[in-house]
């Protein structure tokens, strides 16, 4: 009998407890989708049910058959070629008008046209969900516990608020970190934190700091003007809606939440209790940034092997390289080939729709990596300790290569002016100079030396939000302040008034005393 009980207990322990939840994914495109797809696969392994909203004109999302993965397809008034056109225009505009101190204004004007088209597509994607009452009713009945989105593709937050569920962001960057700074309330001191897309490092000269300061404020202005149209859309979508989202309040023995530097970790005893702490009065106008600021957790797709040290907030988690994995053995011959398998294909040859870059970088004979500077490719090179020759093209790629150059793991070649001699020289440099390989291996050791793997951290925080109905105890009070309170302008103004008043009174007293003593002196002389 005892043996049977022990055997039954062992079986129960092996089976484990199924705590599968329901996760909703807002649609996204390009590398944004590829990164979130990795997280989706891991959530499914942990027996969660995942539903992905898919516009009928989606370019990258391909529905597959999986009992734990549902693709909710809805109609939009455009096809795949529309999104493909927007992406193509974005790349070409950037290549033809790469921003520099002398071309930044023209770049802004040209990019504004592309972003306007992108916003039109995004609003049609939003309308396809928000104006589809049947779909919204179905989503409400599904009892989702969290929504995962990317702030580059708006409206996921609106859907989450309408469904009354918490939402999270997966984000690589925003230009000059404008979204993280103004919506997420992360401090970005321009004196030592380089603006994203500035191609600067944290070691800045006086001239660099001037350039960095201008870059921050210029890109803030661009964000304000290019994304302003979303404020009215958000107000209209959320207008008249009374929101009541479950949150958490926390009492910590170390006090209130505050920004931390990478070298600091918080250890604290928390006493948590559930509360209902957020209400949007009916009809009150809101903004895109205010709504984004309600995200429970921000999963930032970089890490300190890539980033320069800077302050961050407790609800920002760095998960760079979450897609990286050990290399698989490779065949003798790799062939990127689409179509019917050739009848004469040799046994030593394997066909691929897409060359397995990660496996190639992990091969022991790989000496260098020629890359355009995409974040995913750079992280695979870091993971396997491979030095790089960067040929950046657009978006964050020049900035990424600047980071790798500063860390001594890459050499850059200019796409517009390079020759075969330049490329060969760069390759010989990273292959023959030991410092590049040593620095690449140092970054690799840093990346691998983490207490929890990036993918596991990302999944943990999604499950954390599901378990606790949010993460309000990690939300800083900065979100509750007006802009002049946040910058302490009211306090500075009050102190200036006090100092000015004190100086005025002292001067008046001095003048009064001088006049008084002057009259007494004159009176004595007369006497």
UniProtKB/Swiss-Prot annotation:
Intracellular or extracellular location(s): Membrane; Endoplasmic reticulum membrane
Tissue distribution: Olfactory epithelium, brain and fetal lung. Not present in liver.
Top class in the EC scheme: transferase
GO cellular component, one term: endoplasmic reticulum membrane
UniProt-listed SUPFAM superfamilies: UDP-Glycosyltransferase/glycogen phosphorylase
Segments on the Cytoplasmic face: 513-527
Membrane topology designation: Single-pass type I membrane protein; Single-pass membrane protein
General remark: UGT2A1 isoform is part of the UGT2A complex locus which displays alternative use of promoters and exons. The locus is defined by 2 alternative promoters giving rise to 2 functionally active polypeptides UGT2A1 and UGT2A2. Alternative splicing of exons results in additional isoforms for each protein class.
Keyword terms, alphabetized: Endoplasmic reticulum, Glycoprotein, Glycosyltransferase, Lipid metabolism, Membrane, Olfaction, Sensory transduction, Signal, Transferase, Transmembrane, Transmembrane helix
Pfam families referenced in this protein's UniProt entry, alphabetically: UDPGT (PF00201)
GO molecular function, one term: glucuronosyltransferase activity
Enzyme Commission number: 2.4.1.17
BP GO terms, sorted: bile acid metabolic process; response to symbiont; sensory perception of chemical stimulus; sensory perception of smell; xenobiotic metabolic process
Gene: UGT2A1
Ranges in the topological domain labelled Lumenal: 21-491
PROSITE patterns: UDPGT
Species the sequence originates in: Homo sapiens (Human)
Residues passing through the membrane, by range: 492-512
Catalytic reactions on record: glucuronate acceptor + UDP-alpha-D-glucuronate = acceptor beta-D-glucuronoside + UDP + H(+); 16beta,17beta-estriol + UDP-alpha-D-glucuronate = 16beta,17beta-estriol 16-O-(beta-D-glucuronate) + UDP + H(+); 16alpha,17alpha-estriol + UDP-alpha-D-glucuronate = 16alpha,17alpha-estriol 16-O-(beta-D-glucuronate) + UDP + H(+); 17alpha-estradiol + UDP-alpha-D-glucuronate = 17alpha-estradiol 17-O-(beta-D-glucuronate) + UDP + H(+)
InterPro entries tied to this protein: UDP-glycosyltransferase, UDP_glucos_trans, UDP_glycos_trans_CS
Glycosylation sites: 49, 347
Record's protein name: UDP-glucuronosyltransferase 2A1
Function comment: UDP-glucuronosyltransferase (UGT) that catalyzes phase II biotransformation reactions in which lipophilic substrates are conjugated with glucuronic acid to increase the metabolite's water solubility, thereby facilitating excretion into either the urine or bile. Essential for the elimination and detoxification of drugs, xenobiotics and endogenous compounds. Catalyzes the glucuronidation of endogenous steroid hormones such as androgens (testosterone and epitestosterone) and estrogens (estradiol and epiestriol).
Major location (coarse): membrane
Signal peptide, first to last residue: 1-20
């Amino acid at each position: 009998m005892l043996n049977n009980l022990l055997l039954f207990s062992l079986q129960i322990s092996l089976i484990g407890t199924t705590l599968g939840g329901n996760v909703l994914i807002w649609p996204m495109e390009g590398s944004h989708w590829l990164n979130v797809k990795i997280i989706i696969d891991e959530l499914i392994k942990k027996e969660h049910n995942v539903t992905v909203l898919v516009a009928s004109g989606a370019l990258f999302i391909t529905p597959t058959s999986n009992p734990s993965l549902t693709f909710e397809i809805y109609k939009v008034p455009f096809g795949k070629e529309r999104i493909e056109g927007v992406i193509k225009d974005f790349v070409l505009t950037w290549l033809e008008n790469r921003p520099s101190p002398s071309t930044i204004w023209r770049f802004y004007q040209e990019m504004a046209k592309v972003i306007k088209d992108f916003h039109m597509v995004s609003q049609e994607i939003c309308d396809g969900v928000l104006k589809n009452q049947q779909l919204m009713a179905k989503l409400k009945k599904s009892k989702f516990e969290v929504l995962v989105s990317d702030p580059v593709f708006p409206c996921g937050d609106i859907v989450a608020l309408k469904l009354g569920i918490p939402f999270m962001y997966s984000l690589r960057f925003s230009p000059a970190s404008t979204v993280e700074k103004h919506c997420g309330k992360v401090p970005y001191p321009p004196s030592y934190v380089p603006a994203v897309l500035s191609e600067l490092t944290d070691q800045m000269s006086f001239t660099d700091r001037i350039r960095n300061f201008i870059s921050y404020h210029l890109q803030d202005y661009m964000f304000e003007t290019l994304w302003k149209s979303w404020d009215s859309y958000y107000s209209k979508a959320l207008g008249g809606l009374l929101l009541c989202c479950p949150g958490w309040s926390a009492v910590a023995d170390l006090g209130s939440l505050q920004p931390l530097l990478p070298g600091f970790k918080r250890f604290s005893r928390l006493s948590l209790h559930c509360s209902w702490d957020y209400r949007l009065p009916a009809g009150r106008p809101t903004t895109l940034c205010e709504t984004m600021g309600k995200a429970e957790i921000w999963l930032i797709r970089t890490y300190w092997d890539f980033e320069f040290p800077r302050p961050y907030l407790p609800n920002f988690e760095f998960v760079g390289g979450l897609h990286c994995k050990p290399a698989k053995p490779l065949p003798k011959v790799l062939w990127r080939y689409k179509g019917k398998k050739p009848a004469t294909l040799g046994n030593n040859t394997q066909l691929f729709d897409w060359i397995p870059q990660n496996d190639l970088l992990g091969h022991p004979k790989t000496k260098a990596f020629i890359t355009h500077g995409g974040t995913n490719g750079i992280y695979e090179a870091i993971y396997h300790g491979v030095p790089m020759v960067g040929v950046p093209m657009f978006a964050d790629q020049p900035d990424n290569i600047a980071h790798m150059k500063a860390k001594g793991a890459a050499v850059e070649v200019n796409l517009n002016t390079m020759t075969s001699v330049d490329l060969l020289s760069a390759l010989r440099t990273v292959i023959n100079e030991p410092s590049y390989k040593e620095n690449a291996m140092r970054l690799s050791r840093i990346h691998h030396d983490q207490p929890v793997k990036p993918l596991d951290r990302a999944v943990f925080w999604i499950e954390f939000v599901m378990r606790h109905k949010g993460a309000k105890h990690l939300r800083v009070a900065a979100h509750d302040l007006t802009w002049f309170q946040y910058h302490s302008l009211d306090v500075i103004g009050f102190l200036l008034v006090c100092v000015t008043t004190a100086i005025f009174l002292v001067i008046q007293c001095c003048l009064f005393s001088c006049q008084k003593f002057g009259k007494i002196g004159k009176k004595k002389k007369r006497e």
